[in-house]
Amino acid sequence: KIFEKWDLDFVIIGKTTDTNKLTLKFDNKVKGEIPINALASQAPIYDRKWIKKKLPDKKIDLKKLKKIKIEDALIKVLSSANHSNKNWITSQYDQMVMCDTAQKSGADAAIIRIHGKEKAIAVSVDSSANYCKAHPLTGGKQIVCENWRNLISVGAKPVAITNCLNFGNPEKPEIMGEFAECLIGIKEACEFLKYPVVSGNVSFYNGTNKKNIAPTPVIGGIGLISKFKKSFGHQFQDDNSAILLIGKT
């Protein structure tokens, strides 16, 4: 009914049965049958060796930090490409197609309204390869928490996440260790926040010229906004807008 309503092409390719088998037919003749358990609970499980990442024992030399002028540090931070205006990207496509976008790009999460409802969906996709490379366990936690923060910053209640886990060669114990520790971090953060993982994907053997990529788990989360007209923007509304700092810095 949904596909017909929006005039979308579709075809029914099968139906759910209670045979516990995946049955393949062609011209109404059975061409193959596969036990479902072989694709799920009875699928082979790899138990690869992995080692915990040895973190560098680095201590900050405060004497060296004192030599940095606060003016120079501020200019260096503000001139970073990470803080530059992104309009040159977002202005090249129609952000308001079908008028479903509740606010323009630039916020920590995108907001899409639901037809005929006051509700809206917030979406955020996050990753931090450098963080996960430095400390896989904390990096895994941080990505989930960042995704959560991005959703609540626009007024959404986080509902669920999916993931795309991108890593190097898992046959190398140190790479498998990055994978394992990132997963532990993601798991612990999701359990603490009660943030269910509804789907996911793993991509191994990523690298160039025999050099593995940094551990790059990507988290995509959605949240629900009960009334999209009350969603939060990312810009100051007037000169007297308050700035709230949450947590220690």
Segments (PLM) and residue ranges:
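Glycine/proline-enriched, intrinsically flexible loops and inter-domain linkers
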Residues: 1-249
